[in-house]
Amino acid sequence: MIQQESRLKVADNSGAKELLCIRVLGGTRRKYAHIGDVIVCSVKSATPGGVVKKGQVVKAVVVRTTNTTRRKDGSYIKFDENAAVIIKDDKQPTGTRIFGPVARELRDKNFMKIVSLAPEVL
């Protein structure tokens, strides 16, 4: 569960390293974001020479959460860290590579480019 002020690692090569969640999109009083949800973030740390700079406000999609997620078949999935991928307004990733595994729920939410770039889909 990602909420306001949550910090996330960046799972792509856009240049950002850490994000701070500012807002969870999808409703006026929505509190939590889960895997596949879009959030508005501020870049807290970035690598020099990257596409994204520190202090920039970006949209990102959550790809890994430490909270357990229940699937339709009754199984649960849980990751070691909270991570997100920075996206543009047309839901395409800013970076050209994705690091680490991503959840299968992204395919249901139509983030096909992220799923195809990921080295492993769990």
UniProtKB/Swiss-Prot annotation:
InterPro entries: Ribosomal_uL14, Ribosomal_uL14_bac-type, Ribosomal_uL14_CS, Ribosomal_uL14_sf. Pfam families: Ribosomal_L14. Keywords: Ribonucleoprotein, Ribosomal protein, RNA-binding, rRNA-binding. GO terms for biological process: translation. The keyword S-adenosyl-L-methionine does not apply. Belongs to the universal ribosomal protein uL14 family. Binds to 23S rRNA. Forms part of two intersubunit bridges in the 70S ribosome. This is Large ribosomal subunit protein uL14. It comes from Alkaliphilus oremlandii (strain OhILAs) (Clostridium oremlandii (strain OhILAs)).
